[in-house]
Amino acid sequence: MELAAWCRWGFLLALLSPGAAGTQVCTGTDMKLRLPASPETHLDMLRHLYQGCQVVQGNLELTYLPANASLSFLQDIQEVQGYMLIAHNRVKHVPLQRLRIVRGTQLFEDKYALAVLDNRDPLDNVTTAAPGRTPEGLRELQLRSLTEILKGGVLIRGNPQLCYQDMVLWKDVLRKNNQLAPVDMDTNRSRACPPCAPTCKDNHCWGESPEDCQILTGTICTSGCARCKGRLPTDCCHEQCAAGCTGPKHSDCLACLHFNHSGICELHCPALITYNTDTFESMLNPEGRYTFGASCVTTCPYNYLSTEVGSCTLVCPPNNQEVTAEDGTQRCEKCSKPCAGVCYGLGMEHLRGARAITSDNIQEFAGCKKIFGSLAFLPESFDGNPSSGVAPLKPEHLQVFETLEEITGYLYISAWPESFQDLSVFQNLRVIRGRILHDGAYSLTLQGLGIHSLGLRSLRELGSGLALIHRNTHLCFVNTVPWDQLFRNPHQALLHSGNRPEEACGLEGLVCNSLCARGHCWGPGPTQCVNCSQFLRGQECVEECRVWKGLPREYVRGKHCLPCHPECQPQNSSETCYGSEADQCEACAHYKDSSSCVARCPSGVKPDLSYMPIWKYPDEEGICQPCPINCTHSCVDLDERGCPAEQRASPVTFIIATVVGVLLFLIIVVVIGILIKRRRQKIRKYTMRRLLQETELVEPLTPSGAVPNQAQMRILKETELRKLKVLGSGAFGTVYKGIWIPDGENVKIPVAIKVLRENTSPKANKEILDEAYVMAGVGSPYVSRLLGICLTSTVQLVTQLMPYGCLLDHVREHRGRLGSQDLLNWCVQIAKGMSYLEEVRLVHRDLAARNVLVKSPNHVKITDFGLARLLDIDETEYHADGGKVPIKWMALESILRRRFTHQSDVWSYGVTVWELMTFGAKPYDGIPAREIPDLLEKGERLPQPPICTIDVYMIMVKCWMIDSECRPRFRELVSEFSRMARDPQRFVVIQNEDLGPSSPMDSTFYRSLLEDDDMGELVDAEEYLVPQQGFFSPDPALGTGSTAHRRHRSSSARSGGGELTLGLEPSEEEPPRSPLAPSEGAGSDVFDGDLAVGVTKGLQSLSPHDLSPLQRYSEDPTLPLPPETDGYVAPLACSPQPEYVNQPEVRPQSPLTPEGPPPPIRPAGATLERPKTLSPGKNGVVKDVFAFGGAVENPEYLAPRAGTASQPHPSPAFSPAFDNLYYWDQNSSEQGPPPSTFEGTPTAENPEYLGLDVPV
């Protein structure tokens, strides 16, 4: 017979359906259309399964039933979890009048929840049938209460006597959201069907009787109702109801759509664990329930496993193991370490597709005590399969099952070796749980075997399923087993037929032994008794124990005869022992050591590896006594008692020991003397060397080779500063637009003033002083510089005012008016500024377009030194511990290994150029910052901007090489972009560039600065610090503020440590400058090196005041141009003439020599030393960005709130949960910010920036 391992639920008893106590639940079958294994007992099998059952946890399969079969045991069924199959029956009616719902958790042929097939009389089509004979077969469905099929369709075919299947409104029965709802039925009948009863509305019925009218609960409902009890809008059922209801509440449902919780329909069962929001603890929920099928139960039924998630299951999930409690309940428990290996049977894991035990898989069960799965022995097991190369199973191979104690599935045997008279290879099998049932019904099946007895003497439990034993013509002892004691629920039973009659067994003496209690046994002999009437010795029943006579002597414990210890002396008139241990003897057979009987006294025996050996001897009474001498080693000489003899030392041994000791002492003395002498020689040599060096030194040593940092820091008075307008505010303090009026001078200098808030922590003051130290030491026209510092109670940094804001906002605002010359000039200037920082050994770490300020449309400066770090003279790289960093601008080694070098700044420079060429687009927009490292390692880079030629884009790509040494140096970038700036339209292609306006001279932020009337009559900060009076005019008044700009522009820009630099620009009242004229400072990047070298004809027409900033730096700090450039980056003759470059035909007349002394230039290799009084954080990083008590790190990026311009100390609402837009620091989890009362402008936090203190 073909075998299929079907996983089915066992027989159960639990509370399930709404409003009913003691609802009986039973399992279904899974045989489909196969013939029953035992047709003789098939009806009995169904009766045992469904007698009194109300909920079928599985499939209801009614097949191959005769015409006279009594099916009254089906009348209580109300719910079927799987599908319902009525096929190949000859009965006229199936009494399922109470069936309400078919859930369709399993479907027949994967489509149908209800299948009625071939229920006909074999003589139905025979024309010679006897007249007046009523054909057999199903005549009516009579499913009068069926109002819901949740999933699956209907299949009705081959039922010639069946009526009314087409009178049913199946649309009302099938659920609206039922995706698999085909209705496939034929109406071919061999008889005429009466009409439905007149009381049936719309002529819908299940049978001829008025009680069989169809109850409609779906199609008659008003809009929005899934089920209802009537046509009125108030008749709607609760949304958790299925099959209809008696009222609107979820306790009025006829069946539950999801789960039934004590008569109330719920979407989920109550969780076992709840969260207490008051105590922040997880607590046991006293109302928690386990999920079992469509019901909520307090405990899982027997033979089911409870899980931590609150479900009842048959198989534990991965990384869990079965645990049986003392009360017999079973649960799945998570393994604290890798779960121990288990033995899997058929239907599980790698044996899921195996049909039977064969010679190929039997060795997997060697040594197994518990098998998770089933065992099946088919004829092919012992015949083999030559086509697949499987050898026949030999009988001796079955000995591997002698250690087996438990099977979680079923045991099926339809073939067995003829030489075996029983199943004694399973003599130690105690439990067959039946979590997996054969045909969905049987946990033990024995059929067609030649055995004479069962031999399962240790079997004590069949946890679920029926036992089927039939067609075993030689088998006796079937009825001598107390099967009721093995079963665990009332639906279990033994089905047997075709076995050897008991009378024939009795005639041959195949009966239970007389020592078997109640005549219960598994086979002949005293070893096959279920229980013994007298005593049990091992596995054998005996009349008495060997307490007084016989060897070995025994003692009695209950009804078990247990042997005494072998060292116990047998007694004739009393018990020999009262236990099985050596210290439980009445007398010893040999010797007694303490309280235990021993065969011999311990002689040199170590009771434990860590103890000394013990020596004992027996006295006259046989009691072990300790020896006078306890030898520990070399115990060779023993006396007559077996104790160690006294050892006398030999003179040779003494002499050898003395000589060896003396030699060792002499060697140690010599070694110590040598070491002392060498130590004195080294001290003498070092002393002489030091004295010689002290006499020969004539000048101080400079081991590092670093030149002193002679940068100057201006200390300003608070009375010299005048604050006009708030530019930004944050957690650390406020940035103001202001004026610096030096004492004793009639000048006004526009500045940006950063003021720390009150009660600033000492660490915050130290960090801002560190930033001031870095800014004060720079000296490049392309790097923002510090003007001074005011040491009031709240430290104030004073920086240059920049009128156009940051470069990022500038290119976004004027993207339609920027030319290729503008973009390339900015690239050159940024590269020169970074090249200068490389020379002074300063790693910027935060280069981006937002950190480049625009002094004029032709002049930009690098700023934001909040993350910048100086390298010592012997350092080439910097390793950071954490803090805020811009992930999308950083090199890969900086993200992964926190390694920052000048070459990592080259990577950031490439991203900055990309921002310019895309007019302020966001790099890697839409990609989370956490994915950036993997994206870069896979080779992905930013795409080529539309306006860039391949020449410009290849420079960007070189900046983004994984190997930092393969990236270009900044001096090389200066050279490359300077070459491109001479022919800009060849390398940057902008549509309609020639038709567009000139470079923008105005900005939104510039106009905002014009609102203040006090900004007139001002002097540029750089002109004041490095005056060039008398260069073009001997009149010193030209250097004053009288001829300075009358109207000014300013913008606020984010600066790394709180720096905000602003500058000046002529107003619209002044006449327009020549395109060749520089604007405040270094001017356009067409000026390379000394800005006073190489003056063209256009420069000669400028006023002395306009050209004075050009003479501020005597030498370009990055890379001097070759002589033939004459100090300019001019376009080639074939190129159009853009702004800011000299005309090709204009040649410089004569070089101009600055009359004033140029500012000191730091030589190459010079470094900016850290001040000894300032102690940065780890590795020089000042990473406590929350030290100021808030979450906004750099308020310069924040626009001031409306209405705060007139307030010197604005206090807008500030949420500490927000941070700077471009950075995200994860160090906040390690140290919380101190309480702060300061309120600043909120900004959104950008999650695309991560801290480096957590691996990316």
From Swiss-Prot:
<feature type="binding site">
    <location>
        <begin position="727"/>
        <end position="735"/>
    </location>
    <ligand>
        <name>ATP</name>
    </ligand>
</feature>
<dbReference type="InterPro" id="IPR020635">
    <property type="entry name" value="Tyr_kinase_cat_dom"/>
</dbReference>
<feature type="disulfide bond">
    <location>
        <begin position="564"/>
        <end position="577"/>
    </location>
</feature>
<dbReference type="InterPro" id="IPR011009">
    <property type="entry name" value="Kinase-like_dom_sf"/>
</dbReference>
<dbReference type="GO" id="GO:0050679">
    <property type="term" value="P:positive regulation of epithelial cell proliferation"/>
</dbReference>
<dbReference type="GO" id="GO:0046982">
    <property type="term" value="F:protein heterodimerization activity"/>
</dbReference>
<feature type="disulfide bond">
    <location>
        <begin position="316"/>
        <end position="332"/>
    </location>
</feature>
<dbReference type="GO" id="GO:0030971">
    <property type="term" value="F:receptor tyrosine kinase binding"/>
</dbReference>
<feature type="topological domain" description="Cytoplasmic">
    <location>
        <begin position="675"/>
        <end position="1256"/>
    </location>
</feature>
<feature type="modified residue" description="Phosphotyrosine; by autocatalysis">
    <location>
        <position position="1249"/>
    </location>
</feature>
<feature type="short sequence motif" description="Nuclear localization signal">
    <location>
        <begin position="677"/>
        <end position="690"/>
    </location>
</feature>
<dbReference type="GO" id="GO:0032587">
    <property type="term" value="C:ruffle membrane"/>
</dbReference>
<dbReference type="GO" id="GO:0016324">
    <property type="term" value="C:apical plasma membrane"/>
</dbReference>
<dbReference type="GO" id="GO:0005737">
    <property type="term" value="C:cytoplasm"/>
</dbReference>
<dbReference type="GO" id="GO:0071364">
    <property type="term" value="P:cellular response to epidermal growth factor stimulus"/>
</dbReference>
<dbReference type="GO" id="GO:0005524">
    <property type="term" value="F:ATP binding"/>
</dbReference>
<dbReference type="GO" id="GO:0016020">
    <property type="term" value="C:membrane"/>
</dbReference>
<keyword id="KW-1003">Cell membrane</keyword>
<feature type="disulfide bond">
    <location>
        <begin position="516"/>
        <end position="529"/>
    </location>
</feature>
<dbReference type="GO" id="GO:0042734">
    <property type="term" value="C:presynaptic membrane"/>
</dbReference>
<dbReference type="GO" id="GO:0007528">
    <property type="term" value="P:neuromuscular junction development"/>
</dbReference>
<dbReference type="InterPro" id="IPR016245">
    <property type="entry name" value="Tyr_kinase_EGF/ERB/XmrK_rcpt"/>
</dbReference>
<dbReference type="GO" id="GO:0033088">
    <property type="term" value="P:negative regulation of immature T cell proliferation in thymus"/>
</dbReference>
<dbReference type="Pfam" id="PF21314">
    <property type="entry name" value="TM_ErbB1"/>
</dbReference>
<feature type="disulfide bond">
    <location>
        <begin position="26"/>
        <end position="53"/>
    </location>
</feature>
<dbReference type="GO" id="GO:0038143">
    <property type="term" value="C:ERBB3:ERBB2 complex"/>
</dbReference>
<dbReference type="InterPro" id="IPR032778">
    <property type="entry name" value="GF_recep_IV"/>
</dbReference>
<dbReference type="GO" id="GO:0048471">
    <property type="term" value="C:perinuclear region of cytoplasm"/>
</dbReference>
<dbReference type="GO" id="GO:0070372">
    <property type="term" value="P:regulation of ERK1 and ERK2 cascade"/>
</dbReference>
<dbReference type="GO" id="GO:0038133">
    <property type="term" value="P:ERBB2-ERBB3 signaling pathway"/>
</dbReference>
<keyword id="KW-0732">Signal</keyword>
<feature type="disulfide bond">
    <location>
        <begin position="237"/>
        <end position="245"/>
    </location>
</feature>
<keyword id="KW-0067">ATP-binding</keyword>
<dbReference type="GO" id="GO:0016323">
    <property type="term" value="C:basolateral plasma membrane"/>
</dbReference>
<dbReference type="GO" id="GO:0005769">
    <property type="term" value="C:early endosome"/>
</dbReference>
<dbReference type="InterPro" id="IPR036941">
    <property type="entry name" value="Rcpt_L-dom_sf"/>
</dbReference>
<dbReference type="GO" id="GO:0030307">
    <property type="term" value="P:positive regulation of cell growth"/>
</dbReference>
<dbReference type="GO" id="GO:0042060">
    <property type="term" value="P:wound healing"/>
</dbReference>
<feature type="glycosylation site" description="N-linked (GlcNAc...) asparagine">
    <location>
        <position position="188"/>
    </location>
</feature>
<dbReference type="GO" id="GO:0042802">
    <property type="term" value="F:identical protein binding"/>
</dbReference>
<dbReference type="GO" id="GO:0045785">
    <property type="term" value="P:positive regulation of cell adhesion"/>
</dbReference>
<keyword id="KW-0547">Nucleotide-binding</keyword>
